[in-house]
Each structure stands twice: as C-alpha cells, then as structure tokens.
C-alpha cells in the first residue's frame, strides 16, 4: 500500500482538477441564471464546512493544539478566502479567456515560492516542465476561445485573478507541513469553518436577498455539483495529493483543468477538436511528467550524502 501512495496521490490530483475543470462551465452557467459570484463563493464555503463537519462525526477525533488552529486560520485565508474571492470577483470583471490564461501562472508562483520557503531546488527539468505545461494550457485556452468575444478583458480583473493564483501558491508552500500533520477531514473541517466565519458577515445579506423561488432547478443542480464535487470531493482529493507530493507537483495539475474543459466541450458538441489542441495536450502531459520526475531537495541531499560516503 505504501508503494502505491504516489500513484494514488497523482490520481487524486487528476480527478480533483478534472472536477474543477467541469465546475467552470457549470458554475458559470449557474451564475448567469439566478445567483451571483458572491452567492456561489458563500455556498461553496458554507456548504463545504457543513459537509466536512458531518463527515467528521464518522471519523476518528483528532486533537489540534491552539497553535495549529491559529495556523489553520492562515491556511483558510490563503487557500480559500483570498483565492476564491479574488478569482470570482476578478472573473466577473474581466473576460473568461483572460482569467483562464492568468490561472496558468499558479505553478510558476508555486515553483518560485517553494524554492524560497521550502528550499526546493529549481532544476532544469522542473522549470522545463512548468514551461511546457504553461504553454500547452495557454494554447488550449486560446484555441478553444470564441473568435469574437462579447466581453473585453479588464486589467483590474486580471490582477485579481493573478492575486488568487499567488494566494493559492502561498498556501501550498507555507502550510505544506501543517496539512500533512492531520487527516484530510480535520484540516478541511477547520479551514472551511474559519473561511465561513470570515466570509459570511460580508455576504449574508447578499445571499439572503436571493429570490429562491425564481431560481431555476437547473441552477440549483449546477450549484449542488459545484459545492459537492467541485468543493467537498475536490478538496479531499487535493489534500490526499498534498500529503504525498511536493507543492510544485501539486500545482502543475492546474493545467489539467483547461484540458478537461476543452474535452467536455468537444464531446458535447460545443467545441471542435483542432490539431493544435492535440499538441497542447501532449505539452501538458509532458510538463506534468517532467515536474513529477524532477529531483526534490531530499533526492539531491541523498545523492550528496551517498557521494560523501563513497569518497
């Protein structure tokens, strides 16, 4: 079982990002038929908190010291509140294509921050993997965009989306050790609880003003998918991956999201597959493989110790 941990971690990250890729079109449709971005963020955070607390009733209890509870507030701020609020508000200001392109910056931030905070080396293979993945993701986004977009990008929205990526990259680097210390359910339970406490005072009146009877059933089903699969299940899967893999490896799976979005659009007949998209898929897969195969700090230290022992 121990030998299968890396494989399980990679599969969990793939499916988490696949759900996020599916969440994008469903969430966007919901936010144009009865609810707003602020409502969606509130539903995700509060819904996640309720689901994780219910799940915790059926899992072993874990004692979390006060110091770590305070640290989890920081994790909630960077991993949930700032990330989700900045991206959702940014998306409402700028164009979807601009927002999608900006999200490709997250693995770059994660690689740089992991080098500064965790002292993870930026190897040639790792840097090349991030470049390949970023290039492939941008090609996917640009080639799948509509020829004529009714919405023009806005620098304010772009900067907010950029801030969301930086926030999540900081979360991956700053709280990597804390996340590994406790179970996935315990960490998420407290993170979503703190996020709810921080967000709800500012969004409650907005959500209370929804005309619930006028919201279509399809919108509630889409919102349900976003809350359950795009939030609850995805955060469980992502943290399983975090328990085993390095922050840069976790972040590189961000490039799977546009891949899934384009695949779904082609399968449903909304989009048309193009040869350039085939190249983009190859680049994304190659990028993920290169980053996964790059040497970690521990690998390099082991090699150095082995050389010293041989000398």
Give the positions of each predicted feature.
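Glycine-/small-residue-enriched transmembrane alpha-helix faces in small-molecule transporters
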Residues: 1-43, 150-177, 197, 201, ...
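Juxtamembrane helix-entry segments on the extracytoplasmic side of multipass membrane proteins
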Residues: 5-10, 34-38, 42, 64-70, ...
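Helix-helix packing/entry segments at the starts of transmembrane helices
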Residues: 11, 42-43, 84, 98-105, ...
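Specific transmembrane alpha-helical segments of multi-pass solute transporters/efflux pumps
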Residues: 19, 23-24, 53-103, 139, ...
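Hydrophobic/aromatic residues within transmembrane alpha-helices
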Residues: 30, 40, 44, 90, ...
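Transmembrane alpha-helices of multi-pass small-molecule transport proteins
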Residues: 32-82, 109, 167-174, 189-208, ...
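Alpha-helical transmembrane segments of compact multi-pass small-molecule transporters, enriched
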Residues: 47-51, 102-116, 131, 194-199, ...
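Hydrophobic transmembrane alpha-helices of multi-pass small-molecule transport proteins
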Residues: 52, 73, 113, 125-144, ...
């Amino acid at each position: 079982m121990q030998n299968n941990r890396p494989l399980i971690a990679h599969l969990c990250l793939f499916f988490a990002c696949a759900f996020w890729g599916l969440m994008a079109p469903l969430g966007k449709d919901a936010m144009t038929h009865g609810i707003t971005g602020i409502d969606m963020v509130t539903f995700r955070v509060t819904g996640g908190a309720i689901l994780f607390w219910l799940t915790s009733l059926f899992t072993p209890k874990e004692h979390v010291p006060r110091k770590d509870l305070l640290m989890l507030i920081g994790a909630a701020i960077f991993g949930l509140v700032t990330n989700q609020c900045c991206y959702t508000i940014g998306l409402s200001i700028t164009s979807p294509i601009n927002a999608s392109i900006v999200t490709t910056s997250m693995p770059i931030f994660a690689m740089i921050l992991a080098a500064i905070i965790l002292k993870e080396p930026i190897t040639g293979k790792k840097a090349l993997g991030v470049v390949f993945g970023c290039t492939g993701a941008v090609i996917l986004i640009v080639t799948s965009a509509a020829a004529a977009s009714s919405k023009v990008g806005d620098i304010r929205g772009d900067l907010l989306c950029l801030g969301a990526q930086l926030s999540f990259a900081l979360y991956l680097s700053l709280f990597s050790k804390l996340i590994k210390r406790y179970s996935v359910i315990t960490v998420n339970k407290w993170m979503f609880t703190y996020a709810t406490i921080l967000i709800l005072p500012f969004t409650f009146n907005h959500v209370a003003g929804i005309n619930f009877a006028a919201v279509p059933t399809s919108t509630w089903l889409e919102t349900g998918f976003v809350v359950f699969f795009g939030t609850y299940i995805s955060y469980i899967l992502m943290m399983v991956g975090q328990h085993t893999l390095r922050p840069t490896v976790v972040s590189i799976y961000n490039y799977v999201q546009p891949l899934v979005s384009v695949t779904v659009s082609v399968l449903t007949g909304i989009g048309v597959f193009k040869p350039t998209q085939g190249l983009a898929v190859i680049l994304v897969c190659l990028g993920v493989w290169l980053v996964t195969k790059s040497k970690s700090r521990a690998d390099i230290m082991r090699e150095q110790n082995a050389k010293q022992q041989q000398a």
